[in-house]
């Protein structure tokens, strides 16, 4: 009897599991798609030259790998990226070494991770056809980087793009983990960790979680209910702020890096009307849809087609905003019980990021769109999460598939562009050939030359200070300006820099030799220029 009963049960189990190829089809397709996306984005990132910002991050990671984990002596920008992108740079440099291509590899890894995480957040707990449509819609919207400004804003440097990663991880945690106290603690730790690396987390992570959770909790209290999980999650998010501040102070106390003061402040009222069109263009540029900035028929076509992604995100934002208003309205606890916590946080995060950009920055060009770079992955996740089901029920999947295919083709076309050499690779090679190993330059030439040379040339960043020149407190290892231990006998500049050859002569006297190479002016002295620099300036 045991034989007759075991056979059918074993057969059902085999059928339920399905044949091996079917069970592995989706994981294989997912892996292949992620690899294809990585290499496409890597090629697209390569169309942009590696400049000083990315070079500085690469040099910081290199020092962290080689005995300076706290970046002693470094004066960073207003964003350290210490717990966000710099660990990724370290991992890549362990394999690839110190070279300009590290910046492109990190950009491709970050963007691929963002697409994957946005797809998972969009999918949520849905399975089957709806879960697939949700994920593909989010991933499709993110096939947006266009050549030029969009690629620069999203891929060139760790300029807030990667800050979307911890926020999406947080939303996955909230969506998938049990509603228990330890989930709230884990969320708070994740926010504190990310906040050390980028203060933007305060706007797109801490603030949305606190606002949504505590608003829900207060609404429930009015109906004599206590939402302990929302209270715990909101409090954990709020406590991430003092925790991150304590971590930053601890790093400084241990002799670690110093962060520059954030220059952002409320703009004057007269600036706001000018910010309106630039904010709109910045938003559209993230989706490759900045029609006003497109030049040429091909780029205009690219931008017009990519308007679809921006429109979908705007539609999801309106829908999500309406649901959030209903959740927080006087409709009783039943509405809040059915509300989507993740979608609510996404709505507040997107609105907060755009509002901060509009109110705190004098937006002069679309290049500043990197300040709202997380809006792209967060918006894509929101669109997939809220619109995937309705699109499926409206039988618009064929249209979605066609759009996804077209976006993929256009990404491939954008990735086929000419690969750009590092920004100052030519002059770095020239300096090596002429035996010049330690010098100074304006910011955009200094660390870039150091990276382009693989670290064989040391360059310090200087700026005007009165009638002389001084080291600049911005993405710089200030130890190299110690004239007792280091020397610098040449100066490099290009047309357009504030530090001109005339300024260098006024500061250091007549040079012993002057060279001109491809637009660069290289001035050499037979003395240590560090002794004639003024005190460091911010």
Q: Where do the model's predicted regions map?
A:
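Hydrophobic, aromatic-rich transmembrane alpha-helices
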Residues: 213-223, 300-337
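Short periplasmic/luminal acceptor-recognition loop of GT-C membrane glycosyltransferases, typified by
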Residues: 79, 433-471
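Membrane-interface alpha helices of multi-pass inner-membrane proteins
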Residues: 182-210
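Membrane-proximal lumenal/periplasmic loop motifs of glycosylation machinery
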Residues: 44-52, 65-90, 101
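Hydrophobic/aromatic-rich transmembrane helices and adjacent perimembrane loops
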Residues: 159-166, 203, 301-315, 334-391
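Signature aromatic-anchored transmembrane alpha helix within multi-pass, membrane-resident enzymes
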Residues: 27-33, 235, 239, 331-335, ...
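Membrane-interface micro-motifs in multi-pass membrane enzymes
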Residues: 78, 82, 128-175, 197, ...
